[in-house]
Amino acid sequence: MSRFQNKIVLITGASAGIGEATAYAFAREGARLFLVARRREQGEAVAQRIRDAGGTAVFHPADMSQRDQIGAMVASCVAHYGGLDVAFNNAGIDGAFNVDTPDHPEEAWDQLLAVNLTGVWFCMRHQIPAMLATGGGSIVNMASMAGVKGFPGSSGYAASKFGVVGITKAAALEYADRGIRVNAVCPAVIRSDMADRVFGTDERSKEEEAGSWHPMNRIGEPDEVADVVLWLASDQASFVTAETIKIDGGLGA
């Protein structure tokens, strides 16, 4: 099944983790990929692996905290492929964890909001007009379980991700009758560089600590998030918009 044959798909944060897994999943279903990340070498390697497997992908370096780079990113995608059908605004940072609100560093707060929230907002500001120009599209934003449920010691990250949920719903309602669907995914702990930074790199202790957060008693896998992103972006979810889908092993029940 090729749900995305020749569809133009832009993915930010595509050099590793969930973004990388999602890029491969879209490629397997025939998408033409425009991959974005700060890390040029890793991002180029992902694009090359897709091309080596017979897919279509180009890499574009950009920093989601730099507004001019976001506009240039979308313009470059449209110039290269002729439009934009799907956007997965996945890029994000973790910032400061296990820090009480009064002690949260201001610099970390500012950077979290700049990348995780304002970056997504600016992406949509440029992606929506590009999609309208060709009759519509689908946007999936990366939120988090920290965007729908409170966790102590994460006020900056929570603010950024609750904000993503809010702007997702607002944009979805603004364009619901104009052919653009906007949804968000809210993963819990997924095997990734971010999980390594928060829980450490020892796999056994990480599985025990992070896995215990979830009723399913394990960490999620990037492919499990990618599957949901592709469904939301596909015509199978044609009547789904303004949703926040939890991928959490039961954590939010």
Predicted regions and their residues:
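Conserved glycine-rich cofactor-binding loop
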Residues: I8, S15-G17, R39
